[in-house]
């Protein structure tokens, strides 16, 4: 009886039992509830095919999608002090860093690279929202400063893709110090005569909005992106008033003159190339000029 219980039954159960399905195999659209297979979503640049809803795009995928043929030089992550305040809330900050690194396979929030977009050399800086909410800490601030220094040295434009909840509270004042540091870095690039374009993605809030995210020469935004300083709920509780429909969305900000264009994710590389070639006085092909004009009209409609 023992051999049946101990050997045969487990073998049968293992063959007939339910298999574990990865949690991220199917992705649900927040707007329509439609379920999309993860491979189909990745193939469509993390945009829901039917509704057009723009999901959060991983930083590595965004860099690969932006640059020609997905080829670029990754900028190294600067070394900074780890958990200098020995911060702990419900969990040790050092444990949060470890878990986020395992989850994203990144050292910190920021990924930066140098490459070409339609033949035009530029530096791109991308936030990874899945790394502690894309928050700005010492490591992220240092990486951003180094990216601006590289763009200044290379005499090329810089494009920023923020996606952040703001300053990283676990680093306290050391995090807040990154706001003026990154602002100075932006000024350094502008003084060199190079363009700085910001592509606002969902969400862009808090201290990031209060610093480098709103200092671009031109501001683009992805459809439906939430952009603001404080959250809608906090503002309503403070003012004790109901806010307008669509408040803090990319479309609302476009209507009120806070962003220049709302651009679909598939059109971002072409739009950036066209704008940067104009700003750097490089020749723009007639085909690109026509397509870019169509995008601009669609965005402002």
UniProtKB/Swiss-Prot annotation:
Q: Does the keyword Lipid metabolism apply?
A: yes
* Keyword line: ATP-binding, Cytoplasm, Fatty acid biosynthesis, Fatty acid metabolism, Lipid biosynthesis, Lipid metabolism, Nucleotide-binding, Transferase
Q: Boundaries of each CoA carboxyltransferase N-terminal domain copy?
A: 25-294
In terms of domain of life, where is this protein from?
A: Bacteria
Record-level GO BP terms: fatty acid biosynthetic process; malonyl-CoA biosynthetic process
> What's the EC number here?
2.1.3.15
Instruction: Indicate the principal place this protein occupies in or around the cell.
Output: cytoplasm
Reactions accelerated catalytically: N(6)-carboxybiotinyl-L-lysyl-[protein] + acetyl-CoA = N(6)-biotinyl-L-lysyl-[protein] + malonyl-CoA
Location(s) in or outside the cell: Cytoplasm
Q: What class of enzyme is it?
A: transferase
Q: Which GO cellular component term is one of those annotated?
A: acetate CoA-transferase complex
User: What pathway does this protein act in?
Assistant: Lipid metabolism; malonyl-CoA biosynthesis; malonyl-CoA from acetyl-CoA: step 1/1
Give a single Pfam family match. Answer: Carboxyl_trans
MF terms from GO for this chain are:
acetyl-CoA carboxylase activity; ATP binding; carboxyl- or carbamoyltransferase activity
Gene3D superfamilies documented for this protein = 2-enoyl-CoA Hydratase, Chain A, domain 1
Q: What does this protein do?
A: Component of the acetyl coenzyme A carboxylase (ACC) complex. Biotin carboxylase (BC) catalyzes the carboxylation of biotin on its carrier protein (BCCP) and then the CO(2) group is transferred by the transcarboxylase to acetyl-CoA to form malonyl-CoA.
Q: Which family does it belong to?
A: Belongs to the AccD/PCCB family.
Q: How does it assemble?
A: Acetyl-CoA carboxylase is a heterohexamer composed of biotin carboxyl carrier protein (AccB), biotin carboxylase (AccC) and two subunits each of ACCase subunit alpha (AccA) and ACCase subunit beta (AccD).
Q: What is this protein called?
A: Acetyl-coenzyme A carboxylase carboxyl transferase subunit beta
Q: Which organism is it from?
A: Rhizobium johnstonii (strain DSM 114642 / LMG 32736 / 3841) (Rhizobium leguminosarum bv. viciae)
């Amino acid at each position: 009886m023992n051999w049946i219980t101990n050997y045969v039954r487990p073998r049968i159960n293992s063959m007939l039992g339910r298999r574990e399905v990865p949690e991220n195999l199917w992705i649900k659209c927040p707007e329509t509830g439609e379920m999309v297979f993860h491979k189909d979503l990745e193939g469509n640049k993390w945009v829901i095919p039917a509704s057009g809803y723009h999901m959060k795009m991983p930083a590595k995928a965004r860099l690969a999608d932006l640059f020609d043929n997905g080829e670029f030089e990754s900028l190294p992550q600067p070394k900074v002090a780890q958990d200098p305040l020995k911060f702990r809330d419900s969990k040790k900050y050092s444990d949060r860093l470890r878990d986020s690194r395992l989850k994203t396979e990144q050292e910190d929030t920021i990924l930066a690279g140098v490459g070409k977009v339609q033949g035009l050399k530029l530096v791109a800086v991308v936030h990874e929202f899945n790394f502690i909410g894309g928050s700005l800490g010492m490591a992220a601030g240092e990486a951003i400063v180094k990216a601006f220094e590289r763009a200044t040295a290379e005499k090329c434009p810089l494009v920023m893709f923020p996606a952040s909840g703001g300053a990283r509270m676990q680093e306290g004042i050391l995090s807040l110090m990154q706001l003026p540091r990154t602002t100075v870095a932006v000024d350094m690039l502008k003084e060199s005569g190079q363009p700085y374009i910001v592509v606002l993605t969902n969400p862009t809030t808090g201290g990031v909005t209060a610093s480098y995210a709103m200092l671009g020469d031109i501001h683009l935004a992805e459809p439906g992106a939430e952009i603001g300083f404080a959250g809608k709920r906090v503002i309503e509780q403070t003012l004790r008033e109901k806010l307008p429909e669509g408040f803090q969305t990319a479309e609302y900000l476009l209507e009120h003159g806070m962003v220049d264009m709302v651009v679909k994710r598939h059109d971002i590389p072409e739009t950036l190339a066209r704008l940067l070639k104009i700003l750097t006085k490089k020749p723009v092909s007639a085909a690109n000029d026509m397509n870019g004009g169509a995008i601009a009209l669609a965005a402002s409609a």
